[in-house]
Amino acid sequence: MTVPDPPRDPDAAALVARGADAVSFLALERAMHHWRDAPPPAGTGALVAYADTGSAWVAAGGPITADPDQRAPAAARFVAAAAAAGRRACFFATESPALGGCNQLLLGEQPVFEPRAWPATLARHRRLREQLRRARAKEVRVRRVGPAELVDGSPLRAEVDRLAGEWLGSRRMEPMGFLVALEPFHAPEQHLYLAAERGGALVAFLSAVPIHARRGWLVEDVLRGRDAPNGTAELLLDAVFTHARDAELITLGLAPLSGPIAPWQRLARWLTRPLYDFRGVRAFKARLHPVRWEPVWLAYPRGSSVLRHLIDSLRAFASGSLVRFAARTAARHPGVPPWLLAVPLVPWTALLATIAATGNVHLLAYSRPALAGWATFDAFLAAVLFRIAFRPRARWLATVAGAAGVDAVLSVAHRIDVGFGHGPLQIILRAMATAAPLVGTAALTWAALRASFLERSQPP
């Protein structure tokens, strides 16, 4: 299958036909805003698709221009236009090694496959062939689906919507927007759709969009149901390489926080493991044996804070407030509260151990042995919470909530006995020591109830 012609709409045609970044086509999604520069010679004629967070314009990839040499000037003009509107600006998921006036932060890498090399890849890797064999042995069949089968109200559309809801419900975080919004039906005539069926029932679905300027495809969504046999995802991707055999490349998109990232990014990857399996995403894409990995960047104006632009980007994905997004995620996903409690418990435990070791036990009005025992208990609790965050089970959460409840009762009783002290440091530390177990007990109790509800809702 060749890459289709761009849409007939002139603006959309200019956008998708010139875009070389893998995410360029996603600019057609409903939530995107478009900035168009003045045509030459007054401007560059560039198009930039972006999300407006209220304080920043976060672009989807780099500027799209007829002349690649105009990308850097277009980036500068977009930043200036954002500033005139009272917004910061950055470019998320650009593949350009440099944009004029911008610094770059490596976000991760994306795998690149060449369809013509796929048969040789299969021939070299027995495990990959075995995955395909498993799915076929379970009578999974993949077929290409046309837009007419996916119109609103059609049986297949209803099945895909069901699969999407099931898939989103299995995620550890709330659904996100911007470049990862689940919107497979925009510009359907441009998509490559594949359905994996078993016994006439849909078990997985794949959507790919063109990268026109590189004669390639981006696999934007792979939805896999609970009943999909092992190897179903690989069978879908094998079908992509077959149907798009005339393309120059196919990519599965960004594997975030992978590749030669900075130490602080590796720490962030480790800390957020219960929320997003960064290593698992990279491992899945790697086991298909791409011909190469390409870097993907965040570009932001020189002299500005990279942290601020990262927060802007996260707000674009959260479709608003990060606090509200975190609250929704914590309320609905039982693995999140134990993780949110475990992370601050690590420095708190270190503080308790330091106070015990230095003899400053008057700060919390405990004896040194009691404080050392408390630090040991909290260290064990943090380890258990991290473990539960990966596999939240109602029984485990209820047990830990009970332990936190005992800690809360003892802490409140101790505070009633010795008071909050006199100096600011004593008051702050003792207030934290009293409030934390109470908050933890409430959060873990909620998580246990939520996990119990989800476990009862699972099909037998």
What do these predicted regions represent?
Residues 4-58, 87-99, 103, 116-134, ...:
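A conserved beta-strand-loop-helix scaffold within acyl/acetyltransferase catalytic domains
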Residues 328-344:
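Cytosolic juxtamembrane helix and N-cap/initiation of the first transmembrane helix
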Residues 341-376, 380:
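Hydrophobic transmembrane helix segments
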Residues 347, 369-389, 399-409:
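Core segments of alpha-helical transmembrane spans in multipass integral membrane proteins
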Residues 351-362, 410-422:
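Juxtamembrane "helix-exit" motif on the non-cytosolic side of transmembrane helices
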Residues 363-373, 420-434:
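Non-cytosolic membrane-interface motifs at loop->transmembrane helix junctions
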Residues 378, 396-416, 433-440:
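Hydrophobic alpha-helical membrane segments
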Residues 435-460:
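Membrane-water interface at the C-terminal end of transmembrane alpha helices
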